[in-house]
Amino acid sequence: MFNFINNIQNYSKEAVQAAQYIGQGFMVTFDHMSRRPVTIQYPYEKLIPSERFRGRIHFEFDKCIACEVCVRVCPINLPVVNWEFQKEKKKKQLQTYSIDFGVCIFCGNCVEYCPTNCLSMTEEYELSVYDRHELNFDNFALGRLPSMVENDAMVKNMKGLGYLPKGVIESHASS
């Protein structure tokens, strides 16, 4: 009889513990139900990228000294730098500069190690094209100023996903 009572006590303890685990699962589910959805309606809603977002690379032709540091630090030797040595000035003269964004991994090494800061990362992430050869940007395309998501009047800006942190997420542009 004593063994039977012990079995009933153990069973009831395990049943209460199982109910607690199920209750914890429901609490997590209800917590996630109260949050904003993660999915955004992309063409009409856009996320404002974070402050350190690594998007398209912006290039300033006048600042470049054709030192080719960007090519040496690139893990895939991507930037193509064409220059010509001018004997009278004893200096390199930059002819063309290009980056193929179809191959670029957006690591940011070229931007970080550039001695003249002629390269910078922008917040532009819409680089989709039908032909991959259009992703090969020359110095004119790289010099184009980026379009800011915040200035697009046709788009409802999303300040953040709101999924991981609770509360309101402020964009870096408004602070």
UniProtKB/Swiss-Prot annotation:
Domain of life: Eukaryota
Catalytic activity annotation: a plastoquinone + NADH + (n+1) H(+)(in) = a plastoquinol + NAD(+) + n H(+)(out); a plastoquinone + NADPH + (n+1) H(+)(in) = a plastoquinol + NADP(+) + n H(+)(out)
GO CC terms of this entry: chloroplast thylakoid membrane
Function as written in the Swiss-Prot or TrEMBL entry: NDH shuttles electrons from NAD(P)H:plastoquinone, via FMN and iron-sulfur (Fe-S) centers, to quinones in the photosynthetic chain and possibly in a chloroplast respiratory chain. The immediate electron acceptor for the enzyme in this species is believed to be plastoquinone. Couples the redox reaction to proton translocation, and thus conserves the redox energy in a proton gradient.
Taxonomic source organism: Chlorokybus atmophyticus (Soil alga)
Membrane topology per record: Peripheral membrane protein
GO molecular function: 4 iron, 4 sulfur cluster binding; iron ion binding; NADH dehydrogenase (ubiquinone) activity; quinone binding
Cofactors demanded by this protein: [4Fe-4S] cluster
Pfam families tied to this protein: Fer4_7
Listed EC numbers: 7.1.1.-
GO biological process terms, semicolon-separated: photosynthesis, light reaction
The family this protein is said to belong to: Belongs to the complex I 23 kDa subunit family.
Name this polypeptide is given: NAD(P)H-quinone oxidoreductase subunit I, chloroplastic
Subunit structure and binding partners: NDH is composed of at least 16 different subunits, 5 of which are encoded in the nucleus.
Comment on bound cofactor: Binds 2 [4Fe-4S] clusters per subunit.
Binding-site positions, [4Fe-4S] cluster 1: C64, C67, C70, C114
Localisation per UniProt entry: Plastid, Chloroplast thylakoid membrane
Chief localisation class: plastid
Domain 4Fe-4S ferredoxin-type, first and last residues per copy: 55-84, 95-124
Residues given in the record as [4Fe-4S] cluster 2 binding sites: C74, C104, C107, C110
Protein keywords: 4Fe-4S, Chloroplast, Iron, Iron-sulfur, Membrane, Metal-binding, NAD, NADP, Plastid, Plastoquinone, Quinone, Repeat, Thylakoid, Translocase
